[in-house]
Amino acid sequence: TPVTVKYQAVVKEVVPTSTNATSTGPQGVPQTGTPTFQGGDPLVPIDETVEPTFEDGSKGKSIPGQGTYTIAPDGTVTFTPDKQFVGNPDPVTVKRVDKNGTEVTATYTPTVTKVTPTSTNATSTGPQGVPQTGTPSFQGGDPLVPIDETVEPTFEDGSKEKSIPGQGTYTIAPDGTVTFTPDKQFVGNPDPVTVKRVDKNGTPVTATYSPEFTK
C-alpha cells in the first residue's frame, strides 16, 4: 500500500529591529550618536557589508538654520550645529538592511543647550589728575566654548576710544585693559564704560569699568 507524506514548509517573516539614539551637548559643539540595529533572527543578522546611510541613501544632510549631519561607515552620526542654533534640530533617520535585504530604520536626535558667557565688572580708585586702569574679566559659558581670544575686546559701540566731555577719555588695549585719563580738574565717578567681548560662537558678553577719583 503506497504511503503519501505531505511536507509543507512554513517560512516565518524576519523583521530586524532598532534602537534610536539621542545626545546632549553645548551650543556650537559637534555631537555624535549611534542608533543600533539587530537582526530579527540569529540566522539573519544585519548586513555589515552594506554601509548605513540616511533614509534617502545619502551620507550627509544639511538643515538650514540648524546644522549638518554626517554618517560614518560604522554608523556613528555626527551633528555639527550652526554656531547660534539652540534646541532640538530636526532628527535624522538612519537606514540599514539585514542579510535578506530587509530595511530597518532608527532616528538620532541631538539636543543643543544654550551657552551664555559671563563677566565680572572692574573698578578702581585713585587721586585726581592721575590715569587709572581696570580690566573687566570674561569667562566662557562652557569649557568647550571659551572666549574668542582672536577677537580683540572693544567698547560696546565697537570703538577703542571714548571721550566724555568734562570727565576724561577711556581707551582699551588688545588685552582688555581699560585706561581712563581724567581731565585735570575732574573729581568723583565718571560715566562707566562698557567693554564687549565674544565667545567662540560669536555670542557677545559685556562688562563695565568704573573708576573713581578722589580730590
Q: Where do the protein language model's features map onto the residues?
A:
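Extracellular interdomain linkers/hinges and stalk-like, low-complexity segments
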Residues: T1-P45, P91, K99-P146, P192, ...
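Surface-exposed or secretory-pathway low-complexity segments enriched in glycine-proline
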Residues: V3, V29-T76, T80, V130-T177, ...
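Hydrophobic beta-strand core residues of beta-sandwich domains
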Residues: S23-G25, I71, S124-G126, I172, ...
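Short, conserved beta-strand segments of beta-strand-rich sandwich/propeller modules, principally
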Residues: T76, P89-T93, T177, P190-T194
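Surface-exposed, short loops/turns at beta-strand junctions within beta-sandwich domains
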Residues: K83-N88, K184-N189
